[in-house]
């Protein structure tokens, strides 16, 4: 488990990757399409990717705001997920890579409408 210290200038809707500062001299490139989910750890976040996990000193809200809204959605105060990684939705939970995550009450309407919108388009 690598522990990057911070994220440098972040993504826009057209950005395909972000750079994470791992130490004073090294930046690690993370492809946005490799991100599975982001979990809040108070003032830190854990970014789970296909290739590993990264812990970054940043809040979930500020990091989520910098991600493309058509690719990622906040499902709970503790989780933001990649929309294309959602395997199923049942009641107030989603499944990603065989693991169930509860959708928070304040996020359920947005999550379901976003998923329906993706089905229509």
Where are these regions (language model features)?
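Short, surface-exposed, low-complexity cationic segments
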Residues: 112-115
């Amino acid at each position: 488990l690598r522990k990057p210290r911070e994220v440098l200038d972040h993504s826009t809707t057209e950005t395909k990757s972000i750079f994470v500062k791992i130490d004073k001299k090294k930046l690690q490139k993370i492809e946005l399409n490799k991100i599975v989910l982001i979990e809040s750890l108070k003032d830190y976040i854990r970014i789970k990717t296909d290739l590993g996990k990264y812990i970054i000193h940043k809040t979930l809200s500020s990091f989520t705001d910098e991600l493309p809204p058509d690719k990622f959605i906040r499902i709970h105060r503790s989780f933001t997920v990649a929309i294309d990684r959602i395997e199923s939705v049942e009641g107030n939970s989603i499944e990603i890579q065989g693991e169930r995550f509860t959708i928070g009450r304040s996020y359920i309407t947005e999550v379901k409408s976003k998923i329906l919108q993706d089905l229509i388009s």
